[in-house]
A protein has these predicted regions:
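Amphipathic alpha-helix from the class-I
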Residues: 145-162, 176-181
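Conserved PLP-binding catalytic core of the aspartate aminotransferase-like
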Residues: 163-172, 179-214, 224, 229, ...
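Active-site phosphate-binding strand-loop segment of PLP-dependent enzymes
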Residues: 9-74
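Pyridoxal 5′-phosphate
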Residues: 15-22, 36-38, 66-68, 78, ...
Length: 262
C-alpha cells in the first residue's frame, strides 16, 4: 500500500479475517470506481491463523458486478505455500478456492532466496511490463533459481508428502502439549504456533529461558503486536523430532510452573 502510494481516500483496511467488515468496505466504495483490489494474507505470520478464503471470496463475488473491471483478489501466502494444505499448496488448496493473484516466497518452506507472483498470462505480462517494483531489478540468481526448483520438486514428491505429514504430526503434538499445560494459543493446524503471554517482561524472560535450554523462539511485543497481545512465536519444522517437541514442552512447563514464574 505504501509503495503504491494510494491516496487515503482511495483505500480502506478491513478488520483481520473479517468477511463482514470486508463487505462493509466494499459497500462504501463510491460509484464510478472501475476496479477494486482486495489484498490479504493467506496465513497471518504472527499467529498462524488462516484467512477464511471461501467466505472472503463470496463477499468479493457479490460485489464484482458493481465495478467495470470487477473485484480482483490478491493473496500473500508466503507462510502457507509448502507447509499448508493436503499437498503443501497452501491456503488455496486447504480452502478449495482460488484467488486472482497469488504471491509467495521461496524463503520460508523452500529455504531459498526469492519470491514469485502467480496469475493469468495477461496479468504476469502486465507485471513484467508495468510494475515499478520489477522493472530494472536484477533477476533471481541461477543458483537460487536451481535450488528453488529442487526444493519444489522435493515438496511435490513422495518424500515431500512424508515430510508434510511429519510436520503436521509434530505441530499437533506441540499444540496438544500447550493445551495440556493450560497455556493460551490460537487453534489451527499451521506450524506457526503462537503462545499468548500478554506481558512484555514475561515474554522476554521466557524467550531467554528457552534460549538457555537450547530452544530458539521469537518474542513479539509492542509495537510489533498491540499491548496485551504479547506473544512468543514458535515455528515447527519438518526436521523436528518427537523428542524435540517434548523437550520444548518440558522447557515451557519448567518456565511457566516454577515459583518464579507466578
Amino acid at each position: 500500500m505504501r509503495i503504491a502510494n494510494i491516496p487515503s481516500d482511495r483505500r480502506a483496511v478491513f478488520a483481520h479475517n473479517d468477511p463482514a467488515d470486508l463487505a462493509r468496505c466494499l459497500e462504501a466504495v463510491p460509484e464510478g470506481v472501475g476496479r477494486v483490489i482486495v489484498i490479504f494474507d493467506g496465513i497471518f505470520s504472527m499467529r498462524g491463523d488462516a484467512a477464511p478464503l471461501q467466505d472472503l471470496l463470496r463477499v468479493t463475488a457479490a460485489h464484482d458486478h458493481r465495478f467495470r473491471d470487477g473485484v480482483i483478489t490478491m493473496m500473500d501466502d508466503s507462510h502457507g505455500i509448502g507447509a499448508y494444505g493436503a499437498t503443501g499448496r497452501g491456503t488455496e488448496e486447504h480452502a478449495g478456492a482460488r484467488v486472482d493473484i497469488f504471491i509467495g516466497t521461496f524463503g520460508k518452506a523452500f529455504g531459498v532466496n526469492g519470491g514469485f507472483v502467480a496469475g493469468s498470462p495477461t496479468l504476469i505480462e502486465a507485471v513484467r511490463q508495468k510494475a515499478d517494483t520489477y522493472i530494472y531489478t536484477n533477476p533471481l540468481g541461477a543458483a537460487d533459481a536451481a535450488a528453488a526448483v529442487a526444493a519444489i520438486n522435493i515438496a511435490d514428491s513422495d518424500e515431500g508428502r512424508a515430510r508434510l505429514a511429519h510436520l503436521a504430526a509434530r505441530t499437533l503434538q506441540f499444540r496438544a502439549g500447550l493445551a495440556a499445560l493450560g497455556l493460551e494459543s490460537i487453534p489451527g493446524p499451521h506450524p506457526v504456533v503462537p503462545l499468548l503471554v500478554r506481558s512484555t517482561d514475561t515474554v522476554r524472560a521466557m524467550v531467554q529461558g528457552l534460549f538457555e535450554r537450547g530452544i530458539l523462539a521469537v518474542g513479539l511485543t509492542f509495537p510489533v503486536v498491540p499491548k496485551g497481545d504479547e506473544t512468543i512465536r514458535f515455528q515447527i519444522n519438518a526436521a523436528h523430532t518427537e523428542a524435540d517437541i517434548a523437550d520444548a514442552l518440558d522447557a515451557l512447563k519448567a518456565l511457566t510452573q516454577s515459583p518464579a514464574s507466578r
